[in-house]
């Protein structure tokens, strides 16, 4: 079996590339996916988002090694093992990232990936419902909507931010990210709008696109040229050959693992596992980054939260309405208000993100408070801690060693202390007076730096945004894995295009920029002239040098 292009992974970037590479009918595409079909309400019903990320049917089941700076806790790292990849098990929050994120990419060696370069691709991929005119796309495959915000707590959160002196923004994906405002969702007609729904399924209707179920074991190389992929399906091993190129889009965990199993990575590490060296790229598996967050929870004195919807009878009613009509509480992820703010004067653009939720519960649906409550997920966006993904053995079936080194930089502790105290300030505003009860978490007794630090060690969680392990950069950067056209340095016919190529993590959730990578990489693969650069200037707070708000 062979095709012009072979893509490993049907996730956010992989699905976008399958769609774009096959679009004009000139080239054939094979997408290799080990995961299951994305069928059923547990995947497609937005309110069921906590289920697929906890199910081995849909998730690769990765966890970090015990993290020494948070009391040896091992944090789960859900990655989608399903059509659509992690876009089929994520929280459906859509964030492009800040313009300065991409300018930093370009300045650090990923030339051609500045905001002016990537904005046209964001516009091309979006079908924005209600976004800022002129800044958003309206004809793309990816539907993006805002929630209805029927619950008054969503408005209280935005008003509280305004009362605290922060900006308000109607579209954080438009000209102005900074501020409090509505959150955007990849939901369409009451269903999760994953990369599979947006890109892969339309592509699979074309005669030149084929989906192959199989476990990718390694890249097949002839000398220093990639010519195919060895896969395992059942107990059968076979090679799918690529006439033009192999593109890895297997996630920030599996993409570096696959490179190393194929002889591309740190020479000493490959030798340790008896793997023949093809290209010594010491950056493979390094530069691992993530977003961490804590939940600041408050009791609600009015019975208006989702707490009353957590019993089995209510869940059944919500499920039936969604199955019949795709409406009601099942048709939203319930993340409908958000904020991006700056932590202090001298910070040019936001470095803190908020998700607001009208219930007190963990992101994975566990440990719900036994009362009406609301919460903010809050965390710094630009941690200085860096981790790694390395091989446990040369057996492709073994999970890799994942070390995030969470909270290993002292600045991370100061940033999180500020996040906790700032959230308390926001919840203390007059807008919450009609609703505010006692603080559930951390609890009023947690006040000093040491007490907050202990709370963080026990309760900090991953936001599930791993990236950076196949860093994009200049060819002469020894830690770069791919060049600015996503080509693996030192190997021909092989590219990586997913969140693993991010030089630095972006502001917010990663599904949006990962899809953008797939869109832009497709143009490089096809040898097309990039879309015309944008001349739109994003809003930067004129007071950034003297104030945090």
From Swiss-Prot:
Superkingdom of the organism of origin: Bacteria
Enzyme class: oxidoreductase
GO molecular function list: betaine-aldehyde dehydrogenase (NAD+) activity; choline dehydrogenase activity; flavin adenine dinucleotide binding
Pfam families to which the protein is assigned, alphabetical: GMC_oxred_C, GMC_oxred_N
Keywords: FAD, Flavoprotein, NAD, Oxidoreductase
Annotated signal peptide: none
Name assigned to this protein: Oxygen-dependent choline dehydrogenase
Annotated active site: 465
HAMAP family for the chain: Choline_dehydrogen (MF_00750)
Listed GO biological process terms: glycine betaine biosynthetic process from choline
Cofactor: FAD
Membership in a protein family: Belongs to the GMC oxidoreductase family.
PANTHER family for the chain: CHOLINE DEHYDROGENASE, MITOCHONDRIAL (PTHR11552:SF147), GLUCOSE-METHANOL-CHOLINE GMC OXIDOREDUCTASE (PTHR11552)
Pathway(s): Amine and polyamine biosynthesis; betaine biosynthesis via choline pathway; betaine aldehyde from choline (cytochrome c reductase route): step 1/1
Binding of FAD, residues: 4-33
Transmembrane segments annotated in the record for this chain: none
EC number(s) on file: 1.1.99.1, 1.2.1.8
Catalysis performed (reactions): choline + A = betaine aldehyde + AH2; betaine aldehyde + NAD(+) + H2O = glycine betaine + NADH + 2 H(+)
InterPro entries: BetA, FAD/NAD-bd_sf, GMC_OxRdtase, GMC_OxRdtase_N, GMC_OxRtase_C
Functional note: Involved in the biosynthesis of the osmoprotectant glycine betaine. Catalyzes the oxidation of choline to betaine aldehyde and betaine aldehyde to glycine betaine at the same rate.
């Amino acid at each position: 079996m062979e095709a012009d292009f072979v893509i490993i992974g049907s996730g956010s970037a992989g699905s976008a590339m399958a769609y774009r590479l096959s679009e004009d009918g000139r080239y054939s595409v094979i997408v290799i996916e080990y995961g299951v079909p994305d069928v059923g309400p547990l995947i497609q019903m937005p309110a069921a988002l906590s289920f697929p990320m906890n199910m081995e049917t849909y998730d690769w089941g990765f966890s970090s090694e015990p993290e020494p700076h948070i009391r040896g806790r091992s944090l789960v790292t859900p990655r989608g093992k399903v059509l659509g990849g992690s876009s089929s098990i994520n929280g459906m929050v859509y964030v492009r990232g800040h313009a300065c994120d991409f300018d930093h990419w370009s300045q650090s060696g990923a030339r051609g990936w500045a905001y002016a370069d990537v904005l046209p691709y964001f516009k091309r991929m979006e079908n924005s419902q209600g976004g800022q005119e002129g800044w958003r796309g309206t004809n793309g495959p990816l539907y993006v909507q805002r929630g209805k915000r029927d619950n008054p707590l969503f408005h209280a959160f935005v008003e509280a931010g305004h009362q605290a002196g922060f900006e308000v923004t109607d579209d954080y994906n438009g000209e102005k990210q900074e501020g409090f405002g509505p959150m955007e969702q990849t939901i369409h007609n009451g269903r999760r709008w994953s990369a599979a729904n947006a890109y892969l399924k339309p592509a699979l209707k074309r005669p030149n696109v084929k989906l192959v179920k199989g476990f990718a074991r390694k890249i097949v190389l002839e000398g220093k040229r990639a010519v195919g992929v060895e896969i395992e399906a059942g107990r059968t091993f076979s090679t799918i050959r690529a006439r033009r190129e192999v593109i890895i889009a297997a996630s920030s965990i599996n993409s570096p693992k696959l490179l190393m199993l194929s002889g591309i990575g740190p020479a000493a590490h490959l030798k340790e596992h008896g793997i023949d060296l093809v290209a010594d790229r010491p950056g493979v598996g390094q530069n691992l980054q993530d977003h961490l967050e804590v939940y600041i929870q408050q009791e609600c004195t009015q019975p208006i939260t989702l707490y009353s919807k957590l019993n089995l009878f209510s869940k059944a009613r919500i499920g039936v309405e969604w199955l019949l009509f795709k409406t009601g509480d099942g048709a939203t992820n319930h993340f409908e208000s958000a904020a991006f703010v700056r932590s202090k004067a001298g910070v040019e653009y936001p470095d803190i993100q908020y998700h607001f939720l009208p219930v007190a519960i963990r992101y994975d649906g566990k440990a719900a408070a036994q009362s009406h409550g609301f919460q903010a997920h809050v965390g710094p966006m630009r941690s200085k801690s860096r981790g790694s993904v390395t091989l446990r053995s040369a057996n492709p079936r073994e999970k890799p060693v994942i070390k995030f080194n969470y909270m290993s930089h002292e600045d991370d502790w100061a940033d999180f202390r500020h996040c906790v105290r700032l959230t308390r300030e926001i919840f203390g505003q007059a807008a919450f007076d009609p609703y505010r009860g006692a603080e559930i978490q951390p609890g009023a007794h947690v006040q000093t730096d040491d007490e907050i630090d202990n709370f963080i060690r026990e309760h900090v969680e991953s936001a599930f945004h791993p990236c950076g392990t196949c860093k994009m950069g200049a060819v002469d950067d020894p830690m770069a894995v791919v060049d600015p056209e996503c080509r693996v340095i030192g190997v021909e016919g092989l590219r990586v295009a997913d969140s693993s190529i991010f030089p630095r993590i972006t502001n917010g959730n990663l599904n949006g920029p990962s899809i953008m990578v797939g869109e832009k990489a497709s143009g490089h693969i096809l040898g097309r002239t990039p879309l015309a650069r944008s001349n739109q200037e994003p809003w930067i707070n004129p007071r950034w040098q003297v104030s945090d708000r």
